[in-house]
UniProtKB/Swiss-Prot annotation:
Posttranslational mods: Palmitoleoylated by porcupine. The lipid group functions as a sorting signal, targeting the ligand to polarized vesicles that transport wg to unique sites at the cell surface. Depalmitoleoylated by notum, leading to inhibit Wnt signaling pathway.
Protein's job: Segment polarity protein. Binds to the frizzled seven-transmembrane receptors. This protein is probably a growth factor.
Record GO biological process: canonical Wnt signaling pathway; cell fate commitment; neuron differentiation; segment polarity determination
GO terms, molecular function: cytokine activity; frizzled binding
Disulfide linkage: 107-122
Protein's UniProt name: Protein wingless
Entry keyword annotation includes Nucleus: no
Length: 141
């Protein structure tokens, strides 16, 4: 027979962890392709005289054709990250772009991160400085 109880299952979308999103973005960033915009297929959106405004879908609004900067590379896919110009170098000072450069900055010679000497000094080499610091430890015996 019938009973007065029932089971309900509810499903919902859940975001992945911040770490996994960051890792995926970093992978795409590392594999980004330099492209050129080909204006041979460029078309301005068509104007309509309807009373109701018409917007073409974003993908079709401007038919930009992205071609790889290097002709030996394949064209980027819809999920690939692309860039038009390389980033400026941050190793050398560039006042016009507000880049102070990395000369004279303190680095950590044991780190493999962005504060590490190998990365921060851009392969120029670096001087090490050993310091002995005496501090009071307020120890009690």
């Amino acid at each position: 027979g019938m009973s007065g109880s029932c089971t309900v299952k509810t499903c919902w979308m859940r975001l992945p962890s911040f770490r996994s999103v960051g890792d995926a973005l970093k992978d795409r960033f590392d594999g980004a392709s330099r492209v050129m915009v080909s204006n041979t297929d460029l078309e301005a959106p068509t104007q309509r005289n309807d009373a109701a405004p018409h917007r073409a879908p974003r993908r079709e609004r401007y038919k930009l054709k992205l071609q790889p900067h290097n002709p030996d590379h394949k064209s980027p896919g819809s999920k690939d990250l692309v860039y038009l110009e390389p980033s400026p170098g941050f190793c050398e000072k560039n006042p016009r772009l507000g880049i102070p450069g990395t000369h004279g900055r303190a680095c950590n010679d044991t780190s493999i991160g962005v504060d590490g000497c190998d990365l921060m000094c851009c392969g120029r080499g670096y001087r090490t400085e050993t310091m002995f610091v005496v501090e009071r430890c307020n120890c009690t015996f």
